[in-house]
């Protein structure tokens, strides 16, 4: 699930090599589309939220899924001491959201409810978040603007469809 523009350990080497050229799949929404009893997103930067979701999932019968963002010093190209900060920053800049899905299984009809657990009043800088990691070193200003526009479109959908 490599984000747009990120280089990985398997990205071809060379001056002209660029990171991932596609948007990553939203596994949380794919899982929710299958009507599971419970799905959530979490970040190790917001441990209280993560622990609440683990407790919630523990009490639900059936398949449960929690998609956790947990930075990797080697893969992300940042010091180990910054991992929790990065896990918080990705939420605060709006590139990762904290949410839950609770499915309803009545009469064979699947459906469910999405809940946004944290909405930053104002997003922090996407540019600062991306530039703090070696994996995004090659992103141009235009590509960073594309990431920001993609984030804004995603949040418009969340606010429209999950409210």
What positions do the PLM features span?
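Thiamine diphosphate
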Residues: 1-64, 80
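Flexible, low-complexity linker and terminal segments
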Residues: 72-163
